[in-house]
Structures are given as structure tokens and as C-alpha cells.
Swiss-Prot record:
The keyword Lipid metabolism applies. It is found in: Cytoplasm. The lineage of its organism: Bacteria, Bacillati, Bacillota, Clostridia, Eubacteriales. GO terms for cellular component: cytoplasm; membrane. Keywords: Cytoplasm, Lipid A biosynthesis, Lipid biosynthesis, Lipid metabolism, Lyase. Belongs to the thioester dehydratase family. FabZ subfamily. Coiled coil: none annotated. This is 3-hydroxyacyl-[acyl-carrier-protein] dehydratase FabZ. It comes from Clostridium botulinum (strain Okra / Type B1). The active site is at residue 51.
Length: 144
């Protein structure tokens, strides 16, 4: 089932808020299985003040965080996890392949490959204009 979530609906699912909410919308959601979201990267992002003033580049760790937030929406849409919190449990095989700069639309995709008990694993890919910017395997742990 595909579903569109605006920023207000995202905020009902995950606890992140400005300046750390890094997802603007979810355009596809298969509950408990996968999600696709977007972050419109603007020159006004707080992190560009120091990373780097003369050549702004979105920090890779924040690209991973944006992917984790989309993953949290995917896993928390599973009926048994609704109303809970998803913690970032770990990262494997992270690769950064392209700079993300002001003006980019960052497409954030995750497919949950395994859920066992209160833990999950997802394959995450961030792209800009169809080119991979970052990819990683993300681990989630569900809290109360």
C-alpha cells in the first residue's frame, strides 16, 4: 500500500523536530516494509554555517540520520510498533559517493530486510538526480 505523508503526519510518527527533523515528506510507504522520503536541501540549513562556509556540503552523518528517520517511519508504521520510538541501533557498510549541496533534492529510500522482536535492519540509499549520494545498512531498536 502506497501512502503520502506530509510533515505533520511525519511528526505524529517520529519525535524529531526542527532543527533535527531531516525529512520533508514521505511519498511511498509500505507499512513495516519500506518507505521513500525527500529532504529539500537549502542554503539556509543550520549546518552549512560551519560545514563548510565557502563550499557548503551536507555532512554525511546527517544524510545517514535522514535515512534513519525515513526508516523509523517505515518500521513504526508496523501495527505492533505504532506509538513507540525507533532508536538508531547501528550502521554497517556505509558509503558516501556524491556531495549533497544546497539546491539538491535528496531522495531517501529504505527497505526493511529483517525484523525480529524489537530489532530491525534496513537497506538505505540516498540519491540526488538518480545518482547515489550515500548508502548503508541501518539497524533499529524499538523502545517504549
Amino acid at each position: 500500500m502506497e501512502k503520502f505523508l506530509d510533515i505533520n503526519e511525519i511528526k505524529r510518527i517520529i519525535p524529531h523536530r526542527y532543527p533535527f527533523l531531516l525529512v520533508d515528506k514521505i511519498t511511498e510507504l509500505e507499512e513495516g516494509k519500506s518507505a521513500v522520503g525527500y529532504k529539500n536541501v537549502t542554503v539556509n540549513e543550520y549546518f552549512f554555517n560551519g560545514h563548510f562556509p565557502e563550499e557548503p556540503v551536507m555532512p554525511g552523518v546527517l544524510i545517514i540520520e535522514a535515512l534513519a528517520q525515513v526508516g523509523a517511519v517505515a518500521i513504526l508504521s508496523k501495527e505492533e510498533f505504532k506509538g513507540k520510538i525507533a532508536y538508531f541501533g547501528g550502521i554497517n557498510k556505509a558509503k558516501f559517493r556524491k556531495k549533497v549541496v544546497p539546491g539538491d533534492e535528496l531522495k531517501l529510500s529504505i527497505e526493511l530486510t529483517k525484523i525480529k522482536g524489537v530489532a530491525g535492519v534496513g537497506k538505505a540509499v540516498a540519491t540526488v538526480d538518480g545518482k547515489v549520494a550515500a548508502e548503508a545498512e541501518l539497524l533499529f531498536v524499538i523502545g517504549k
